[in-house]
């Protein structure tokens, strides 16, 4: 929505954050054609988004290495600038990042700067970010997410301080959540508790079917002709 163009999903191991992100990807793919919606996936561990490797909505293969992630983010910044110049917003492109804190640590200032630009200006260009992290540390991601991710989906976290950074508000109680898909949605000053859906890889394959393998990253993002 215009009020929540980007989302941050936080939670420790076992909170269900990867399952929640998978459910979001599956739902978006099921309800939007590849002509209307493009997806970009950054998955440093190579496991979270593996079931979507052949999804027809993918604009490029799932990025795993820091170099692939940076190339993808660089392309997105260029696409944002192109759309700003031309006044276009379609098709919508949603980028899912499986571990924001790790990417910020490994990629350093270059990655942080690209993500900051995209989170600040991407909405007007039809570009959106959904970032997951199990390390909602203020020292690592605090400045990046503080004002730029208005929708927070918070699973069980390790401490009240992590809950504050993840939710963007004090005393959310996220450190007392049960895990396994027990989440808080914090948006526009309101908090809602919900249970995230869980889909096995077999169920995802059954419902999404098999698409063509995306083109290699360089070809997909920089096509010739």
In which residue ranges do the predicted regions lie?
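P-loop NTPase catalytic phosphate-binding loop
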Residues: 1-167, 172-177, 184-190, 197, ...
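C-terminal regions of RecA-like/P-loop NTPase motor modules
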Residues: 210-225
């Amino acid at each position: 929505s215009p009020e929540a163009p980007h989302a941050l999903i936080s939670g420790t191991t076992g909170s269900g954050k990867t399952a929640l992100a998978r459910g979001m990807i599956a739902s978006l793919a099921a309800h939007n054609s590849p002509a209307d919606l493009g997806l970009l996936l950054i998955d440093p561990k190579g496991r979270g988004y593996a079931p979507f490797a052949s999804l027809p909505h993918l604009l490029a293969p799932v990025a795993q290495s820091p170099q692939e992630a940076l190339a993808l983010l660089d392309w997105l910044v260029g696409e944002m600038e192109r759309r700003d110049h031309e006044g276009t917003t379609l098709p919508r492109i949603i980028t899912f990042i499986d571990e924001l804190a790790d990417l910020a640590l490994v990629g350093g200032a270059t990655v942080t700067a690209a993500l900051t630009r995209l989170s600040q200006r991407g909405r007007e260009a039809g570009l959106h970010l959904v970032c997951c992290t199990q390390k909602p540390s203020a020292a690592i991601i605090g400045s990046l997410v503080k004002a730029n991710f208005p929708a927070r989906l918070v699973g069980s976290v390790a401490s009240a301080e992590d809950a504050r950074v993840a939710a963007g508000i004090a005393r959310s109680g996220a450190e007392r959540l049960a895990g396994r898909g027990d989440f808080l949605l914090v948006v526009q000053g309101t908090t809602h508790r919900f249970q995230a859906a869980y889909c096995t890889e077999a169920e995802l394959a059954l419902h999404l079917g098999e698409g063509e393998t995306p083109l290699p990253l360089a070809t997909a993002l920089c096509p010739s002709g």
